[in-house]
Swiss-Prot record:
Enzymatic reactions: L-methionine + ATP + H2O = S-adenosyl-L-methionine + phosphate + diphosphate
EC number(s) stated in the UniProt entry for this protein: 2.5.1.6
Cofactor dependence: Mg(2+); K(+)
Keywords for the protein's UniProt record, in alphabetical order: ATP-binding, Cytoplasm, Magnesium, Metal-binding, Nucleotide-binding, One-carbon metabolism, Potassium, Transferase
Residues where Mg(2+) binds: D18
Listed name of the protein: S-adenosylmethionine synthase
Highest classification ranks of the organism: Bacteria, Pseudomonadati, Pseudomonadota, Betaproteobacteria, Burkholderiales
InterPro entries xref list: ADOMET_SYNTHASE_CS, S-AdoMet_synt_C, S-AdoMet_synt_central, S-AdoMet_synt_N, S-AdoMet_synthetase, S-AdoMet_synthetase_sfam
Protein residues bound to L-methionine: E57, Q100, D242, K273
UniProt source species: Burkholderia cenocepacia (strain HI2424)
Locations listed in the record: Cytoplasm
GO molecular function, one term: magnesium ion binding
Claim: Lyase is one of the keywords in the record: no
Residue ranges of the region described as Flexible loop: 100-110
Length: 395
């Protein structure tokens, strides 16, 4: 890659239609796990103008009011008026869940002498990533993009900008020099709004109240391009503006394009699905590698075959930043992390109802107490095994 380049990532708010769908799917998953933590859940959601469709496969002993959970989630997000795009009180909610296929279940349920030998719920490949661009060990563009739409939601909820509505999108372009963030080049923020706010007043408020307080002062160099509601009007939003679907914001959910993605979405899936659990484990592994001081960037790929517990492959790439070889780090990963599906579930304590919180503002890089995959508790052991000094980020 060139020595001096621009890189861009985007995020969306909790009121974006695809994120509404993700949050409903994960709220349903949490409700099920509260009653039956061994449930098999693949909860998909579609939301459109005045309509929510719940479909997928669920096998559980839990007794759940799916319709009420969908309405409560829409209400929490802030859609309590049809003028905003959907109204939790009046929208239709259709439920069409099947049970998990027995052909899939037999491969996942099969147990051997080792009770950690549960097979993977599907084939596939998953990635984890970490870098030293932020204290949270996340790429800076996606980190800032999340913080912008989080602040938009905060100012909407506390009433400081009463004309804000739930739907919003952000995009941040960062200039890199010698592989490190040097300055912010462009910030795009589009926010749904009440019809009576004038565009100049909206743009000034968004720049002064949302964007500028979010940007790190040391990265503000020269003139930043601020593009606020570039189309000029964003009154129609949410599920009325676009049909929302679970799993359609997988790059927003992860690393903003700074790392590859295996293609599998997260929301609505119980942790027997390696699409979710192995991606969380990949983040955990990568973050501990960087926190241990083994590298300043780390990418992990892990792959699985359906019904087979052991990964079919584990790969580590540190992009030339490693203080020991990638082969040595890969060996350490194999020794210090159990990447079998049930091993991941045990290692990260994933049978908890913790997932609705993940469904907006990123699954990674957030210091939430439930997010066990953000811990750096393996870093000291990795550093000692590799013979290097850990960084100050070990926690």
């Amino acid at each position: 890659m060139a020595n001096d380049y621009l890189f861009t990532s985007e995020s969306v708010s909790e009121g974006h239609p695809d994120k509404v769908a993700d949050q409903i799917s994960d709220a349903i998953l949490d409700a099920i796990l509260e009653q039956d933590k061994y449930s098999r859940v693949a909860a998909e959601t579609l939301c459109n103008t005045g309509l929510v469709v719940l479909a997928g496969e669920i096998t559980t002993t839990a007794n759940i009011d799916y319709i009420q959970i969908a309405r409560d989630t829409i209400k929490r997000i802030g859609y309590d008026n049809t003028d905003y795009g959907i109204d939790y009180k009046g929208c239709a909610v259709l439920v069409a869940y099947d049970k998990q296929s027995p052909d899939i279940a037999q491969g996942v349920d099969r147990a051997h002498d080792d009770n950690l030998d549960q097979g993977a719920g599907d084939q596939g490949l998953m990635f984890g990533y970490a870098c030293d661009e932020t204290p949270e060990l996340m790429p800076l563009p996606i980190y800032l993009s999340h913080r912008l739409v989080e602040r938009q939601a905060s100012l909407r909820r506390d009433g400081r900008l009463q004309w804000l509505r739930p739907d919003a999108k952000s995009q941040v372009t960062v200039r890199y020099v010698d592989g490190k963030p040097d300055s912010i080049d462009t910030v795009v923020l589009s926010t749904q709004h009440a019809p009576d706010i004038e565009l100049p007043a909206l743009r000034e408020a968004v720049i002064e109240e949302i964007i500028k307080p979010t940007l790190p002062a040391e990265l503000i160099k020269g003139d930043i391009k601020f593009l606020v509601n570039p189309t000029g009007r964003f009154v129609i939003g949410g599920p009325q503006g676009d049909c929302g679907l679970t799993g359609r914001k997988i790059i927003v959910d992860t690393y903003g394009g700074a790392a590859p993605h295996g293609g599998g979405a997260f929301s609505g899936k119980d942790p027997s699905k390696v699409d979710r659990s192995a991606a969380y484990a990949g983040r955990y592994v990568a973050k501990n590698i960087v926190a241990a001081g083994l590298a300043s960037r780390a990418l992990i790929q892990v792959s699985y075959a359906i019904g087979v517990a052991e990964p079919t492959s584990v790969m580590v790439n540190t992009f030339g930043t490693g203080r020991v070889s990638d082969a040595v780090i890969t060996k350490l990963v194999r020794e210090h992390f159990d990447l079998r599906p049930k091993g991941i579930i045990k290692m990260l304590d994933l049978l908890r109802p913790i997932y609705e919180k993940t469904a907006a503002y990123g699954h990674f890089g957030r210091e939430e107490p439930e997010f066990s995959w953000e811990a750096t508790d393996k870093a000291l052991a990795l550093a000692e095994a590799a013979g290097v000094e850990p960084t100050a980020r070990v926690a």
